[in-house]
Amino acid sequence: MMVAVTGGPCGGKTTALVELAEELPKLGVAVMRCPELSTLLFGAGAAFPGLGTRAEQLAWDYHKLRAQLALEDTLCSIAAESAQPTMVLMDRGALDSKAFVATGDEAGQHAWEQLLERGGWDEASLLSRYDAVIHLVTTAIGAEEHYSGATSNAARREDVAEAQAQDLRIRTAWQSHPKFCLVSNEHVSSFDEKLRHATTFLYQQEHFLDMITTQSDQTIER
C-alpha cells in the first residue's frame, strides 16, 4: 500500500509521518518512508535553480519527478516481495510537482504539460499510483497563530500568504484522487486531534484493512 502524505507548509506533514512510522508496526504493518525529493536534492547540493532560466528550472522539476517515481517504484517492489504487510509512506507525491510548476497562470500550466510530455506521463496515471492521499492543511489557514515561515524544511520558507496559496495549489492538484482526505485546522483543539483525523481515515481504507487481515492470518498460521 502506497500513501502520499502532503499538505501546505507547517501543516504537520513531517510529524504525521514520524507518528505513522511509529504506530503502524504496532499493528503488524512494516513501514518504508520515501523522503521528499526536493529536500533530498537540496541536501545533495542540487537545490532548485531559483535564479536560473525557466528551462533550467523545468529541467530540475523533470529530473526530480523522474527520480521520485523511480524511488517509489523501488520501494514498492521491495515491499511487494516482503513476507510482512508493508506500507510505503511518501513525503509528498508526484502531483505535488504540479503545484510547484503550474502556479496558476497559463505559462505555468504550459510548463507542466511540457514536463508531462517529456516524461511520457499523464495526470491520471500519476494519481493512480497511490492508494490514498492525506493532505494536512497549513496552519496558515485556520490556525495562523501557530504558523511559522521558518519551517522544519530548510529547502523552503514561505510567509502566510505564500503558504496559503501553496496549500491551495497542492490540494487542487490532488483532490481528484478517489481516496483524498483533507485534514483541516477547523474543529480541532490540538495537533494530536488533527493527526487522529488523518490516521482514522487511513485505518478505514479497504487496502489497509486487507493488510491487517493478512497479518492476522499469518500470525494464526504460525
Labelled PLM ranges:
Residues 9:
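The conserved Walker
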Residues 5:
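Hydrophobic anchor at the beta1->P-loop junction of P-loop NTPases
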Residues 152-155, 162-222:
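NTP-dependent small-molecule kinase module
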Residues 60-127:
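Glycine-rich phosphate-binding loop used to anchor ATP phosphates in small-molecule kinases
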Residues 21-67:
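Conserved substrate/cofactor phosphate-moiety recognition/catalytic segment
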Residues 13:
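Conserved lysine of the Walker
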Residues 16:
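Hydrophobic positions on the alpha1 helix immediately C-terminal to the Walker A/P-loop
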